[in-house]
Amino acid sequence: MDARQMKIEAARAALAYVESGMRLGVGTGSTAEEFVRLLAEKVAAGLVIEGVPTSERTARLCVDLGVPLKSLDELPELDLTIDGADEVDGALRLIKGGGGALLREKIVAASSQRMIVIADESKVVQTLGAFALPIEVNPFGLVSTRIQIEKTAARLGLSGALNLRQSEDGNFMTDGGHFIIDASFGRIPDAEALSIALNSIPGVVEHGLFINMATLAIIAGPSGARTLQANNT
C-alpha cells in the first residue's frame, strides 16, 4: 500500500462517521481531498449533507464533484469536521497548515462539535516539531513580527530557521491575504506554552498548533486503518 492508498484508506474509514443530515466541515490538503472524492460518491448515491470548506481550493473541488456547500456564516455550528494533519501526537495535538489554510481550518474546527483527523502513519509522532510549524502573519510589520517570533521562541528554549513561504508568484498568500512563516524549531516539548506565546504576538494571525481540538484520529498504514484516541498510541 503506497502513501496515496493509505490516505484513501483513512478517508474511507472517516466516512463511517458521516451521517445524512450532517453539517460537515471539510478540510484542506491531500488527504482531505481524497475524503472529498469519496464523499462526493456518497452524495451522488443519496447522502444528504451540507459542507463548509476550509479553503478556496477545497471549495472548488467540492463544487466540481457536486458536494453541496454553505458558508460558515450560513452554518455557524457544525456537527463534524474531517481534516488532515501534518503531524499528530499521542494526545491528538496537531501541526497543521502545510496546505496554507490553517486559519480557516482552525475556525471551522472550533465551530464543530467533533473533529476527526485523517492521516497516514508517517504523520504520527512522539513529540511535535519535525514538520516546520506554519505561522500565519500579517504582511504589515513582517520583519518586526519575525523578530518577535524569534525572541518568543528563544524564551521557550526553541530556535531554528524562520522561512517565509514562497509560491510560483512570490510570497505565498493565504485565502485571507496573509503570509506564512514556516518555523523549523525542531522538537517542541511544550506545545501549549508555545501556542499561548505565539498568540500574544500582535502580528501573528494564527499558528498551526491545534491543541484540544481533535477528538479522534484515523491513521492508515500498510495493514489498514486504525483509530487513535488521546494518549493511546
From Swiss-Prot:
The Gene Ontology biological process terms listed for this entry are:
pentose-phosphate shunt, non-oxidative branch
> Which CDD domains does this entry report, sorted A to Z?
RPI_A
Keywords, sorted A to Z:
Isomerase
Give the residues the record marks as binding substrate: T28, G29, S30, T31, D83, G84, A85, D86, K96, G97, G98, G99, K123
Q: Where is the active site?
A: E105
Any idea of its EC number?
A: 5.3.1.6
* Reactions listed under catalytic activity: aldehydo-D-ribose 5-phosphate = D-ribulose 5-phosphate
Establish whether keyword Isomerase is in the entry. Answer: yes
- Isomerase among the record's keywords? yes
Q: In which pathway does it act?
A: Carbohydrate degradation; pentose phosphate pathway; D-ribose 5-phosphate from D-ribulose 5-phosphate (non-oxidative stage): step 1/1
Please give the Pfam families that the UniProt record associates with this protein.
Rib_5-P_isom_A
What are the recorded GO MF terms, alphabetically?
Answer: ribose-5-phosphate isomerase activity
Query: What is the role of this chain?
Result: Catalyzes the reversible conversion of ribose-5-phosphate to ribulose 5-phosphate.
The record's family statement is:
Belongs to the ribose 5-phosphate isomerase family.
Q: How does it assemble?
A: Homodimer.
Q: What is this protein called?
A: Ribose-5-phosphate isomerase A
> Which species does this protein come from?
Rhizobium rhizogenes (strain K84 / ATCC BAA-868)
Q: What does the record give as the organism's lineage? A: Bacteria, Pseudomonadati, Pseudomonadota, Alphaproteobacteria, Hyphomicrobiales
**Name of encoding gene:** rpiA
